[in-house]
């Protein structure tokens, strides 16, 4: 579109406490969520894949560590870890459980680093916030061969 060059393509927080952007062309008035068509779609025609609201995903949250993903951490760090017998497994309590769900994508209240699709956070599945939503999806409608 004409006039879109150099403008932000997602609704996110720019700096400390700056929810709407700066004065002039970069002010998107995105104090909270914006309409779905406020920004251009991605190459697949999907809107707001980053920014506006975080999206719940189906995954149960599990933190990644070097034992799970050895190729991401090629240095063997077991010499620097506490031994397992030093932990009290009887009274172990964690925020991470089978009820912890992943959300990602960044929201209007998050900084730019959360807009990356690789960033993950978690929240109890029965919780809600003003910055988390979900995306409705369906199979393609119409007949095959009509450009869909």
Model-derived features: positions:
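Disulfide-stabilized, aromatic/cysteine-rich ligand-recognition loop
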Residues: 2-43, 59-148
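Short, acidic, Ser/Thr-enriched surface-loop or helix-capping motifs
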Residues: 48
């Amino acid at each position: 579109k004409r006039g879109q060059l150099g403008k932000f393509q997602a609704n996110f927080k720019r700096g400390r406490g700056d929810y709407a952007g700066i004065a002039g062309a970069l002010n998107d008035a995105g104090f909270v969520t914006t309409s779905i068509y406020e920004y251009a779609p991605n190459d697949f025609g999907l809107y707001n894949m980053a920014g506006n609201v975080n999206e719940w995903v189906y995954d149960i949250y599990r933190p990644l560590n070097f034992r799970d993903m050895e190729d991401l951490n090629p240095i063997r760090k077991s010499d620097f870890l506490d031994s397992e017998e030093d932990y009290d497994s009887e009274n172990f309590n964690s925020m991470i459980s089978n009820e912890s769900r992943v959300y990602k994508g960044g929201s209007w209240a998050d900084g730019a680093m959360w807009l990356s699709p690789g960033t993950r956070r978690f929240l109890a599945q029965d919780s809600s916030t003003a910055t988390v939503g979900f995306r409705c999806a369906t199979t393609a409608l119409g007949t095959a061969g009509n450009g869909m």
